[in-house]
């Protein structure tokens, strides 16, 4: 049985978000709907989830001492990481002292970098993955590329949104790719993964919920990537029954091995009936923002329900839907959005994240749309996103 207190009262149930971006903002809103007290933590002030939290803190979350201090001060009942760049050793210590880390500290630590989760998936669970090697020096990087072969992809073991990633076709690109990877890691320069290129028909995110009433799957989410970050996503992605069954088997193995309750974004490559594991995030996934319009329970609502210990039951998918990012390029600390009225309409919504500034290219919002089919939904979402004019 789940007992929930009332926010700002002595018996309040407190949730602390470690990372307060647009995904954390939606988690905070779902917590608010249940009267939960929300504390948002990030490395910069006025982050999106801070706008809808009861309190907020600005710290370097890779600083274990600072992280322990804010957790000790706030005494949250649930610690909910939204990003990878966190002092996970401290989270494991705190979990050992009785605190509840979502989904669990081990999952957060293993998925903090690509090495932990790749070794779990390929070497412990025996799941199909791309060929790979790890390297922690430029010399070992050259050896890794030689072993994997061209073409290949290099990524920092800890990065997101395509930062530090390069697609390598020839030896002439190696020096530049190594340097770019060293600049793009979340925790600074360091170890990289070199991956062989997988031939696939499409990529999916299989949003997988581990809850008290078992493992549940959302309909597969298809998506298009550009420069290492998603541009559009849609649901459901059409695939064969056999491929879907294999995808669900892989996702089930991964989330049960990681442990804990919550929603996981399991990324997979699909080629015909074959499915290859790519990555997993033990939290809501950016491509899953489409579920804000496509399901009765969004990925954020499912995450909260699961980590609070509530049953999920069934997940209802309404039909073809899509999301398209609003991704302007400018420099401003006073961003405004014009022409939003022309973007919204029947079956079309816009979410603006409220990020405090932009310096270059940054995802500031998302358009959501339904359609008679996925193709129509994608067109409607892209058209809506393009109509929003961002100024600064």
Swiss-Prot record:
Which keywords does this chain's UniProt record carry? ATP-binding, Ligase, Magnesium, Metal-binding, Nucleotide-binding, Purine biosynthesis
The ATP-grasp domain is annotated at 119-308
**What's the superkingdom here?**
Bacteria
Q: Which GO terms describe its molecular function?
A: ATP binding; magnesium ion binding; phosphoribosylglycinamide formyltransferase 2 activity; phosphoribosylglycinamide formyltransferase activity
**Catalysed transformations (reactions):** N(1)-(5-phospho-beta-D-ribosyl)glycinamide + formate + ATP = N(2)-formyl-N(1)-(5-phospho-beta-D-ribosyl)glycinamide + ADP + phosphate + H(+)
Q: Quick one: which residues bind ATP?
A: 114, 155, 160-165, 195-198, 203
Cellular component, GO, one term: cytosol
Q: In which pathway does it act?
A: Purine metabolism; IMP biosynthesis via de novo pathway; N(2)-formyl-N(1)-(5-phospho-D-ribosyl)glycinamide from N(1)-(5-phospho-D-ribosyl)glycinamide (formate route): step 1/1
Q: Give the residues the record marks as binding Mg(2+).
A: 267, 279
In the UniProt record, does the keyword Plastid occur? no
Q: How does it assemble?
A: Homodimer.
The record's function comment reads: Involved in the de novo purine biosynthesis. Catalyzes the transfer of formate to 5-phospho-ribosyl-glycinamide (GAR), producing 5-phospho-ribosyl-N-formylglycinamide (FGAR). Formate is provided by PurU via hydrolysis of 10-formyl-tetrahydrofolate.
Regarding protein family, the annotation reads:
Belongs to the PurK/PurT family.
Query: Which PANTHER family does the annotation name?
Result: FORMATE-DEPENDENT PHOSPHORIBOSYLGLYCINAMIDE FORMYLTRANSFERASE (PTHR43055:SF1)
Q: What is this protein called?
A: Formate-dependent phosphoribosylglycinamide formyltransferase
Please name the source species: Salmonella paratyphi B (strain ATCC BAA-1250 / SPB7)
